[in-house]
């Protein structure tokens, strides 16, 4: 990374079917942390895609769930605790994670025997530990992201060159009635 002057890497939401908290990935996370690198997580190899063979469901439903799976595996697996300075960012507004944080937190509280086996810290405590991108396709969803994590934890998303990306990156932000400072914080110069 240093030789090529890279600031970070992109990985999938799972690697060869292994969740991101798998011990095989600890050396990668340790090296990234030591280098001060960022890790961008994009969903791929979607779980359950065999059951979603019509209507483009793997991309419409599977990808948001896959991203939530990645975030949950990292936080329940204690990766944010092991590497507190490691910077993670997640595509598509963090998938379904932020929309289901209440359910995730409730599950953690009522079933710690299943959820808190590797990390006993409340999932809600992690909302300021990572970034998400702005590509959520809907102003209400973008407003919700801002409410949950703050505009300083949201980066401009494009999903280029994929068809679910914005044709003009940042168009949703540009056309919104958000304050100019918020737009700038989201990576869109007003």
What kind of feature is each model-predicted range?
Residues 2-153:
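Catalytic pocket-lining loop regions of alpha/beta-barrel enzymes
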Residues 86, 132, 136-155, 161-190:
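Mid-to-C-terminal alpha-helical segments outside catalytic/metal-binding sites
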């Amino acid at each position: 990374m240093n030789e090529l002057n890279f600031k970070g890497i992109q990985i999938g939401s799972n690697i060869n079917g292994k969740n991101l908290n798998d011990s095989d990935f600890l050396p990668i996370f340790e090296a990234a942390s030591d280098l001060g690198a960022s890790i961008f997580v994009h969903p791929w190899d979607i779980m359950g895609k065999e059951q979603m063979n019509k209507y483009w469901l793997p991309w419409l439903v599977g990808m948001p769930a896959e991203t939530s799976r990645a975030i949950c595996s990292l936080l329940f697996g204690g990766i944010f605790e092991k590497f507190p300075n490691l910077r993670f960012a997640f595509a598509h507004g963090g998938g379904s994670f932020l929309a289901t944080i209440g359910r995730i937190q409730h599950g953690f509280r009522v079933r710690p025997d299943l959820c808190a086996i590797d990390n006993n810290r409340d999932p809600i405590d992690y909302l300021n530990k990572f970034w998400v991108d702005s590509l959520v396709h809907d102003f209400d969803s973008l407003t919700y992201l801002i409410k949950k994590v703050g505009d300083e934890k949201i980066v401009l998303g494009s999903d280029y060159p994929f068809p679910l990306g914005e044709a003009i990156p940042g168009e949703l932000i540009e056309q919104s009635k958000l304050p100019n400072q918020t737009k700038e914080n989201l990576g869109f110069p007003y």
